[in-house]
Amino acid sequence: FYSAMADVDKQQNVPLLEQVEEKKTKLPFCIFLLCNGAVGAGILTLTSAVGKVGWGMGLCLYVFFGVFAGFANMMLQKVFDYTKENTYSGIGKAIYGKWFEGFVEVIQFLYSIGTCCGYAIIIANELDLSVSFLTEGKEVPASLQFLTERSWLLVIATIFVILPPSLMRKITALRYTSIVAISGILYITIVMMYRAFTTHSCGLAEAANYVCDHAHCLIEANAMKANYTGFDECSLLCEGCEPDPVKSSLRSFIFNKDLFAVLPIFCFGHCSQVQFIPIVADMEKPTKKRVGTVVFFAYFLIFSLYVMNSMSGYFGFCGYSASNVLDSYPALDKLILVGRLIISFALCFTFPLYGYSVREAIVKMFHLQNTAYWKLALVTIVMVLSCMTVGIFFNDLSTVIGITGAIFGASLMAIIPSLLFFKWTKITDCKHKWWNYTLASFYLLLGLVMAVVGTVVTLVK
């Protein structure tokens, strides 16, 4: 009898375990998901960031932030193993209580808002340049002139493309647009490498068009709006001097206050901590070794993509790259135009994903689960229109990305993981507590420095 019962138990248990295992995500897909979680609109600002610190310092910062973000994820993995919570805010609640859960949700909420504002700026800029290409040499009727203006293009895209899917109750299908966005970034990277290989150092900057803004030469993709051709002419007539030797040549290391301005941009480009916890929770056999493998290869891919992209841009434009590297290339560049359209299309449908996350965060923070849907829709409309307004009045992507990375990126990557790791070390019987406290203190200190100094320098610039 007992033998028969044991056989029954065995038959019941084995299929159940196998069924759960089949639903888990395999290791290679986890690598792609984590890579996809970090790579986003921030990659477009990295060429400008490298141009401010030099290619050698840029490589050092890529290595540092890759290792820094990787160790932050491994700290979170230890806390995840202890709490078994499958969300970032969930492990915060398990370690510190409900107040810390609310704090994490607010940071994630503001981070999403900043990302959406960055998307709005990119969409507006790229649509503006795409339309200038399509209308080149053509007479636009006076009644349709507004369709060639950057602000109106963003308004139209927001109302007719971005807002409708943002108001959907469920937008699961839009999750696949991230694949389109990554494809667009890969395409842009290949084109940038091709353009770099077919010119000499700073060659693209020498042939680019410029405008004079407060006695500073700024690269202008639209030739119709430009005042000067080449940085030699612009420097003499706008700045009243010879071209800056630092900006007009390739430099390995540049030491000035701009270093503090680019730290938030590098931080933003490596932030994957929010996505990391759900990925590990859904991973097949999430042992320490397998999770470490995922983190290593994900950030190796991120490093490779960032280096190919930003170094190609820096080689061609040196220190003159626009804050969004796409805005450095001429509007009439057909190969870049394809990339502009792909990324604009993808971001228009990726934007609602963050809008949905913002709406869900508000529902959770204010306990609005049973609230009428029209009220939640109103919240979404206000959020989308607010980001659109930011996109209309700001066209400098590095400012939005800089502030978002400085305050919220530093919090998600360094400050929050360090606080969680502090408490985990205190309440568990882990070995080498002194090392854990030292590591957490380093992360907390550096996170606070990036948040404060990065924000101040970005706002001043």
Spell out what each predicted region is.
Residues A6-E18, E22-K24, P28, M74, ...:
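Membrane-interfacial loop- and helix-cap regions that link adjacent transmembrane helices
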Residues A41, G66-M75, T158-L167, P417:
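Central hydrophobic cores of alpha-helical transmembrane segments in multi-pass inner-membrane proteins
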Residues L46-G54, I171-T172, V460-K461:
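Short, hydrophobic transmembrane alpha-helix segments
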Residues F1-Y2:
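Low-complexity, disordered terminal segments
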Residues L163-I171, F366-H367:
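C-terminal ends of transmembrane helices
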Residues A49, P164-M168, T389-N395:
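Hydrophobic alpha-helical transmembrane segments
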Residues T47-E85, F103:
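Extracellular loop-to-transmembrane helix junctions
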Residues T25-L44, I156-I159, C267-S272, L448-M450:
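The first (N-terminal) embedded transmembrane alpha-helix
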